Amino acid sequence: LTNGLKRNVERLFDDKGHVFLLALDHAQSGVMTGLENISSLMDKLAFAPLDGFILNIGLAGNLARPPFLRKKLVLRTSFGASSLASSYPQAHLNHVSPETALSVGADAVLMMALVGGEDYSSLQPLAADIDAFHQYSIPVVVEIIAAEFDKTATFDVQYHGARIAAELGADAVKVFYVNGFEKVIECCPVPAILAGGPKDRDIGTVAKHAVDCGARGFAFGRNIFQAKDPLEVIGSLREILG
């Protein structure tokens, strides 16, 4: 890594080596419950103990104002298809240039790695995109999902996918909790950030075990913004992460 990229990767994490992100990048779902008015939601959580937000390009401007100026912007730069599409895509292609990411003040970018199926159509462009952002010393976080989406939270997808993404140059990976999660962390040479995913498990229990296994952060969405009391959930998760 270049010195500039090293500095930028380190600055993504706090002094304890942790990062807590609120994921609001659900454009594929159109209007998701809890995200009817993202700007209003962000205002309500402005002073919550979050380190930053994951946003799509069209909402990045929400962080260009007090009190968000010191919050991290992790910019999602890839997109697949909407939930209304007739079929699920085999690749989420990048649609934001490094220059545009810099122009909106992104601290890092986030893109998908789809593994399984015809994953060469996803992984080859991913490797090139990582390299393109690294030319500008922009950190890249890669989220691991399955080409058959319902297999995303399976051990093989997360275990092998995280390692593949790291070897293609990812600076951190966003991974889903699976049985055997400690092996995912053990065999991944870059920091792992836990994704929230569906609300079918107690998020506090999952989060604590993930941190015990070595996860370096959280990137949660629905488990927070669809909660009865998002601030309470954020507070309890921050306590777990430290």
Task: Provide a role label for each language-model segment.
Residues D14, V19-G61, R65-F68, K72-S82, ...:
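Alpha/beta enzyme core
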